[in-house]
Curated annotation (Swiss-Prot):
Pathway: One-carbon metabolism; tetrahydrofolate interconversion. It comes from the Bacteria. It comes from Pseudothermotoga lettingae (strain ATCC BAA-301 / DSM 14385 / NBRC 107922 / TMO) (Thermotoga lettingae). This is Bifunctional protein FolD. Catalyzes the oxidation of 5,10-methylenetetrahydrofolate to 5,10-methenyltetrahydrofolate and then the hydrolysis of 5,10-methenyltetrahydrofolate to 10-formyltetrahydrofolate. The gene is folD.
Amino acid sequence: MIIDCRSISKEIDEETLKLLTICKTKPKLVSFTINPDSGTISYLKSQQKKARSLGIEYETRVLDSVDDLKSDILNASKDSSVHGIFVSHPLPAGINEMEIAKLVDPEKDIEGRNPLNMGYLIYGKEDFAPCTATAVVRILTSVTSVTGKQVVIIGRSTTVGQPAAIMLLRRDRSATVTVCHSKTRDIPSITKKADIIIVAVGKAGFLKKDMVKEEAVVIDVGINILDGKIAGDVEQSVQEIAYLTPVPGGVGLVTTSVLMNRVAKNASRGDSN
């Protein structure tokens, strides 16, 4: 059973278009990338396509050095015509991710990577929560109630696993959350009891059908290349017994819609200042 993420993405896009009708300023998103590979370039092009389809101005800045990246981020943070800043990841080896994240104006941090926004998340403020975690929670709350449910998150990254756990623990959601990682023993015995499973480990087909109970909701965050094709972290046979987000066309699609929605919200906030 496949979860229809396209309808959720469309719903967010419609919210964005409504915001744009009242914006006096045209929203602008600037994406930064340093020495990008073909995968990054492809993703940024899809981001650009989505932005333009919604009427959001989009600019990609391809940089050659860390110093240029830092300088350009600072300039964009100060530029009143820019409403959202995106920095493509992973960054090249040796670059301090937190150092880069701190340079982004917290109010233009549409990815939710700035440590200040991470801190706000603990107190339930999700305006700039990490965008992929936001997409995961949006999908879940669109298809089921999470209150009291046993949720297992596989992966403890700062962009998905940890923030998703915090968001699902929030009092108005009140899920019971278990986070598994590379040192967790006997993961199958844990996932078999879960009502909801979120998988973000970057390993194609990591979650098998025999690790999932019937009627569970499974959110596949993974994007991997397997035999020349895009594959998720979840074995496709899982959809025979559970509800599963597709890859591609699942979490990634909703995440991009979340990003654009934040740019539009920022522009509308600027109008009211």
